[in-house]
């Protein structure tokens, strides 16, 4: 293993506050990790922490530092006050520097139900007019201002070496709302079409490119209705190829999809300019949802554009097999052969079943040329799975 490769762990700041910096640093070192990737902006949720023997509930989406309020307009972040007042991020950065360990931050941009519920007019709106309140729309000027303000604020206050960006795009229609219930199968093409946003800003953007949005809406409405009515047809294997089929048959869908890609690319490039001006490397997930990396377009992300903007593309290598992991990097290299790569691994029980399983996936990523490996997530793992990370990292060292 190259000495420059970063072996990191995703860490929640509340885990640092609860366990103490010394214990967290010890856990990282025992797992043979040389980088702490500490969250600074996160969504709400309920999380099982096995070593703490607790379920932790985050009732709102928020940041873990006190913002510079002069930077913001209508959209203003909510603050995890205890974490911010305790200066957890600054203390963790200092501890990492003293230990010779890398300090990065992991930043969630537009996946914010707290702000979305307060400002539904700034969220993604599907063909039926439903509002996805967990997803601020990147085409909205007010949302763009918020993203740039929060990003700048984070870099100025947290001062990471690198920032890993998540959920700064169009989130898909299926994202795990509280008690999300659906009795019908949702095929890939149906989910893709229901991820299309038709808010005023997206319509204006598309019309400025001479796209007939009225025709697109009629087409999407018809296709979605047919797919819903067909029901079980979406379960046949051929359906997986339906998106490509529809893009070729209907140029208007292709052009509207390109408008979505450009909206995301615009905001990512603006964040890259900010990071570059402050001497911070910008890394990013191609998608915030762990589907195949070549489906990142569901969230309006072009792999080619992402690779051109980001300092490092870090896909969620969460597939069900080593072959899936290998394909992840193959797909990126097809469109961006010179891309700088990282890899994020989840130790979810449905995907990783042993230390050998994890090590095989990590080796696949290393063979693909990744420069960083990040494991999810320190607070969500028991000691057994933390040891799997140690074994995987030791195995990588042996392959050097």
PLM region spans:
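Active-site-adjacent "subsite" loops/lids of carbohydrate-active enzymes
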Residues: 4-11, 104-158, 175, 182-203
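The substrate-binding groove and active-site-proximal loops of carbohydrate-active enzymes
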Residues: 7-16, 66-86, 130-145, 252-263, ...
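Aromatic-lined carbohydrate-recognition surfaces of secreted/lumenal glycan-active proteins
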Residues: 8-10, 14, 102-112, 164-171, ...
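An active-site-proximal structural segment forming one wall of the substrate-binding cleft
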Residues: 26-33, 92, 135-170, 305, ...
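Aromatic-lined carbohydrate-binding/catalytic grooves of carbohydrate-active enzymes
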Residues: 33, 38-83
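Aromatic- and acid-rich polysaccharide-binding/catalytic face
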Residues: 38, 45-46, 235-251, 298-324, ...
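Active-site clefts of carbohydrate-active enzymes
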Residues: 231-253, 283-289, 332-360
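Substrate-binding cleft of secreted/luminal carbohydrate-active enzymes
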Residues: 309-325, 345-400
């Amino acid at each position: 293993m190259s000495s420059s490769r970063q072996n990191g762990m995703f860490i929640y700041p509340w885990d640092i506050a609860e366990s103490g910096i010394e214990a967290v640093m010890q856990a990282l070192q025992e797992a043979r990790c040389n980088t702490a990737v500490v969250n600074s902006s996160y969504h709400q949720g309920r999380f099982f922490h096995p070593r703490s023997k607790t379920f932790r509930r985050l009732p709102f989406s928020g940041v873990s530092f006190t913002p510079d309020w002069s930077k913001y307009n209508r959209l203003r972040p909510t603050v995890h006050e205890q974490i911010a007042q305790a200066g957890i991020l600054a203390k963790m950065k200092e501890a990492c520097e003293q230990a010779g360990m890398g300090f990065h931050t992991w930043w969630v941009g537009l996946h914010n139900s707290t702000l979305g519920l307060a400002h539904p007019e700034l969220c993604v709106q599907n063909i039926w007019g439903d509002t996805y309140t967990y997803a601020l729309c990147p085409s909205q000027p007010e949302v763009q201002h918020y993203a740039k303000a929060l990003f700048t604020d984070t870099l100025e206050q947290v001062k990471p070496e690198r920032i890993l960006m998540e959920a700064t795009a169009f989130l898909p229609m299926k994202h795990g709302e509280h008690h999300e219930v659906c009795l019908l199968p949702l095929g890939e093409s149906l989910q893709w079409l229901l991820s299309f946003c038709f808010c005023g800003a997206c319509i204006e953007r598309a019309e400025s490119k001479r796209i007939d949005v009225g025709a697109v809406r009629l087409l999407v409405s018809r296709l979605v209705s047919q797919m819903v009515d067909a029901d079980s047809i979406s379960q046949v294997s051929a359906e997986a190829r339906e998106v490509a089929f529809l893009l070729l048959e209907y140029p208007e869908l292709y052009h509207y999809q390109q408008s979505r890609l450009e909206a995301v690319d615009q905001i990512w490039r603006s964040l890259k300019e900010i990071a570059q001006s402050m001497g911070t490397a910008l890394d990013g997930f191609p998608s915030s949802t762990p589907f195949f990396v070549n489906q990142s377009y569901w969230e309006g992300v072009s792999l080619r554009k992402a690779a051109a903007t980001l300092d490092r593309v870090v896909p969620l290598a969460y597939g069900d097999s080593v072959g899936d992991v290998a394909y992840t990097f193959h797909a990126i290299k097809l469109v961006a052969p010179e891309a700088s790569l990282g890899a994020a691994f989840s130790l979810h029980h449905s995907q990783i079943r042993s230390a050998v399983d994890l090590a095989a996936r990590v080796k696949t990523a290393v063979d693909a040329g990744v420069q960083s490996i990040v494991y999810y997530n320190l607070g969500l793992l028991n000691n057994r799975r933390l040891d799997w990370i140690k074994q995987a990292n030791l195995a990588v060292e042996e392959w050097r």
